[in-house]
Every structure is written in structure tokens, then in C-alpha cells.
Amino acid sequence: MGILIEKVNTERFSMDFFRFGTGEKTVVILPGLSVQSVMGAAEAIAAAYQSLAERYKIYVFDRRSNLPEAYSVQDMARDTAEAFQTLGLRDVCLFGASQGGMIALVLAIEHPELVGRMVLGSSSAHVREEQYRVIEEWIRLAKAKDREGLYLSFGREIYPPSVFKQYRETLIAAAGTVTDRDLQRFVILAEGTKGFDIVSELDKIQCPVLAIGVFEDSVLDSDATMEIAEKLDNRPDFRLYLYTGYGHAAFDTAPDYRQRILAFFEQGSGEMRSEP
């Protein structure tokens, strides 16, 4: 599969992204918070989304290259919108995972012309004090330059125990490649979630939405997805699905996750129900 790794340059910043796929329509993926840049996982992501690549051109965006000292989720969204506009992307099928879902929400609210359909994965319309505790611990580990501790805490919180056990040694090995710059970027991006709250603006979203959550989300809590549903479930174009047993990173661990995304982008109809 051909993967093109590129950079979009605006007057204010540059942003790395990669793209793959041969379809006519466009899917954009906004990944969640990660210890290292998503660009290093381009091949793995392209392989995971191969079923969508046969029908779509898929863009995966990193955050901007040079981060300011303070960088809120709203700032991330506005920069991502500018990157979209520079590349001529509009009316896209948008998938945002975790923090990427927060960015997607702001995009859909502030730039409805850019988003045609939206899937939110393990995300939230707010980050309150109790939700910030896990992120705050990651920030502490990153500031202490405890690379292994950070990667292990990250894996322990986002994966179910069986998956964490399976990947523990891989996470330890990955920690050895983390640079000081990676840690600095991580802290800025993680701190940017503090105080995020757009619950009162959710009714401004104009596009169809599928919210996918997890009952055992130990990062943002399963209630976060349900709260989005409470604001949008009176709309005929809103769908909700909740997993059991796959952890916060169900977008990586649930075997049928990408098929659900594809079905929503392709049809946008039919009842979506939670697993028993």
C-alpha cells in the first residue's frame, strides 16, 4: 500500500500528515494523545485501515510541528482547520479518537463546512477534574523524564489487562526511543486538555455523528460518551455504540471497530446498539 508522508505549511505553522488509499471520497483521522508522533506508526495505521483505503483517500494528521507553550484543544482544532483549508479538504468523513475526538467536535462546531460525517471514539465534550487525574499522572511522569514509567502507565490505562500484558515488553522497548522533545511535546498536548468543555455548544453540530464508547474507559470514563449522547440523541442522524471489555483504546483493540466506522461513513443508517 502506498503511503505518502507529507507536510502542510501555512503562514503560521507546519503540520505533518500522511495519506493513503485510492477512493474518491476523503476520510480524515485525528489520533489521540500519544507519547510519540503518529507519523512513526504510518505503516501500522495504513494496514489497520486497509478496508477503508479501498473506498477512500485517508489522511492522518499529527499536531502542528512547533508547539506554543500553552496549546488548548481549541487551538489544536483551529490549526487543524487551517491545515484542512490549505489542502482544500472539506465535507470530509472525520474520525477523531480520544483527544482527536475533542478536536473533531470543535471542528464540527466552528467549521461545519469541513465535516460531512463524524465518528467519535472514546472521546469527551469536557475534561473535568476527575477525568484529568490520569492525564495529570502522565504529565508528572513525562516531566520527570520517566520514559518507561510513562509508557507503562499509558498502556495500563488505555488497554484491557490481557492486551497490556501482551504488549508490556513492546512498550518498554518503545520507551527507549523517546526523546526529550517527545516528552516536551507530550506535556504541552496533555496539558491542553485541562478545562476543555464544549458541552453547551454540542447543539451547533450539523453533521451526522456516531459516538463509540467503552463501558470500562479508565481514561475519560464511559459517562463521557453517554453525556454526548444525551445532548445529541434527539437527532435522527445520531448513533451510539458502546463496547465492553476493550478498554479506552477500543479503536485499536476491538476487531470490528473499523467496520463500524466504514458502515457509518457508507450508509449512516440502521440502528446501532450496545453490546450486552
Question: Each predicted region: which residue ranges?
Answer:
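Conserved acidic catalytic loop of the alpha/beta-hydrolase fold
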Residues: 75-92
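Conserved HGGG/HGGXW glycine-rich cap/lid loop of the alpha/beta-hydrolase fold
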Residues: 9-67
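Flexible "cap/lid" loop of the alpha/beta hydrolase fold
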Residues: 105, 109, 116-145
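Short beta-strand/loop motif that positions the catalytic acidic residue
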Residues: 205, 211-213
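Conserved alpha/beta-hydrolase catalytic His-Asp/Glu region
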Residues: 129-131, 149-196, 201
